[in-house]
């Protein structure tokens, strides 16, 4: 048995989807706190880097000059004159488009043997819970991410929302849970997709 001084990261490699990874996983903190560059650096060194999908339309606007949030602001202003903002729903196809653009660029910059995953929080809904979550999940798969970490919610239906996507069985999928009860609920609901 090796002494502590003789241990190296290579002694603890993880095999995941045919790749041998070092045991470094960087979390996906939202609104570009965990930047693409940070996740790419971790992946380049053989670990798993995460980005978050929180506020991806705004992030795409700031990084790529798109107009997702401007479009929303104009629509809200027009609606406010008549009924108020409460009735406005951001078009889910734009959410999927923004996710695919941002996450696709992150994946284009990946080098090395590591992986890039996206942290998707169930609780970010934009007034249309299931439709918004589905668009975010499918946008991530469209972009070619290596994996999705499901967090901030039970995600009982998330596998079903993605199950028709061509990459559903290719991407690594994981869930962050806070209790055995939450895990059991997730497992029971997700088992129907045949992906567990």
List each model region and its residues.
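Active-site entrance/lid segments in N-terminal catalytic domains of soluble metabolic enzymes
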Residues: 1-196
């Amino acid at each position: 048995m090796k002494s502590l001084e003789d241990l190296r990261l290579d002694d603890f490699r993880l095999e995941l989807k045919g790749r041998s990874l070092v045991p470094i996983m960087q979390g996906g903190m939202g609104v570009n706190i965990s930047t693409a560059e940070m996740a790419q650096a971790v992946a380049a060194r053989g670990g798993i880097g995460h980005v978050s999908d929180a506020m991806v339309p705004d992030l795409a606007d700031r990084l790529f000059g798109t107009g997702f949030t401007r479009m929303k602001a104009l629509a809200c202003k027009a609606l406010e004159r008549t009924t108020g903002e409460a009735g406005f729903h951001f078009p889910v196809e734009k959410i999927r488009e923004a996710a695919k653009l941002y996450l696709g660029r992150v994946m284009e910059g990946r080098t090395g043997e590591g992986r890039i995953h996206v942290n998707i929080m169930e609780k970010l809904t934009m007034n249309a819970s299931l439709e918004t979550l589905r668009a975010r999940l499918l946008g991530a798969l469209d972009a070619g991410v290596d994996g999705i970490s499901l967090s901030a919610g039970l995600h009982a239906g998330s596998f079903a929302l993605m199950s028709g996507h061509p990459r559903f069985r290719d991407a690594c999928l994981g869930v962050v849970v806070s209790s055995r009860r939450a895990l059991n609920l997730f497992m029971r609901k997700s088992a129907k997709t045949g992906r567990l």
